[in-house]
């Protein structure tokens, strides 16, 4: 996979599992957080939602941690035009976590078969 301006390009054609894992921490009174996978078959002229997940949190001022995942199967028939990108949305005051030693917030691509 290569990435440019947040858009991921596949290294070869094929059927892929695309997974988006998000870990975060609420720092205030945010009530929800969401993650989404978008895909295009026309090099970004239009984008379709491939997977969406939302997590709700108890509306208290204390810190709260959350994890969510969304996954989709994507048929990449042309590496020049078929791409994916990722999006996160939060009401307010959410810190997304990352780590160099383990996958906390990450994208996972698995080639499953030929197209």
Regions flagged by a language model, labelled:
Residues 1-115:
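Extracellular jelly-roll beta-sandwich "head" domains, especially the C-terminal globular C1q domain
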């Amino acid at each position: 996979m290569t990435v440019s301006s947040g858009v991921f390009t596949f290294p070869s054609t094929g059927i892929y599992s695309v997974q988006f894992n998000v870990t975060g921490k609420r720092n205030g009174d945010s009530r929800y957080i969401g993650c989404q996978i978008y895909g295009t078959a026309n090099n970004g002229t239009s984008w379709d939602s491939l997977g969406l997940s939302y997590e709700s949190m108890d509306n208290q001022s204390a810190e709260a941690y959350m994890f969510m995942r969304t996954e989709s199967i994507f048929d990449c028939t042309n590496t020049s035009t078929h791409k994916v990108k990722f999006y996160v949305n939060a009401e307010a005051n959410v810190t997304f976590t990352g780590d160099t030693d383990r996958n906390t917030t990450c994208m996972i691509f698995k080639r499953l078969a030929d197209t």
